[in-house]
Amino acid sequence: MAVFKTLTDADIATFSTGLVAGVDEVGRGPLVGDVVTAAVILDPNRPIAGLNDSKKLSEKRREALFDEICEKALSYHVGRASPLEIDELNILHATMLAMQRAVAGLARAPELVLVDGNRSPAFTHQGLTLISHSIVKGDGLIASISAASIIAKVTRDREMDALDAAYPQYGFAKHKGYPTKAHFDAIAEHGVFDQYRKSFKPVKALLER
């Protein structure tokens, strides 16, 4: 596996003519819920305008692109690791596992897997070992990684909205489970439940009181 700091879709075309899957994650920092990843294989014959790092897009734009990606992609799949797996493995290894699940779930096998960040797990698809590279800030450079970041972000945000409906006293729709003051205040008042990551320091400290 190589790590690239600058790489574009045009560069990739010079060394891979097969299917390319982009992979990204969301939700490593929150105190609650799954870490969510996505793998996306885009169709070069059906380009999608406006793809970018999901964090740089408005919620409305992310939602619109989410629908377009789902419609036009050759294949996409969401992988995740649960709070229990995060507590057992640690957040890094759980994220790598979720990425592997996303790629393994693709309907088609990619020739190359490109991962946002500076590290990548080993990937297999139906017993075939895949070539993978990581690209620093790849979600703003590579269209398939941008698409994966959008799929993962929208998926997790919707899950936080659903959790907010079930537990409105925590304010998940606003902070999405991240460690904000409002979230800490809610935890102090209402405690934690089974979707919390009990190995994370703020949660662990509360449980040890």
Swiss-Prot record:
Substrates-to-products reaction catalysed: Endonucleolytic cleavage to 5'-phosphomonoester
Domain RNase H type-2: 18-209
Residues binding a divalent metal cation, per UniProt: 24-25, 116
Pfam families the record matches: RNase_HII
SUPFAM superfamilies in the record: Ribonuclease H-like
PROSITE patterns: RNASE_H_2
Predominant location category: cytoplasm
Highest taxon, organism lineage: Bacteria
CDD domains: RNase_HII_bacteria_HII_like
GO CC list: cytoplasm; ribonuclease H2 complex
PANTHER family in alphabetical order: RIBONUCLEASE H2 SUBUNIT A, RIBONUCLEASE HII
Protein known as: Ribonuclease HII
Organismal lineage: Bacteria, Pseudomonadati, Pseudomonadota, Gammaproteobacteria, Alteromonadales
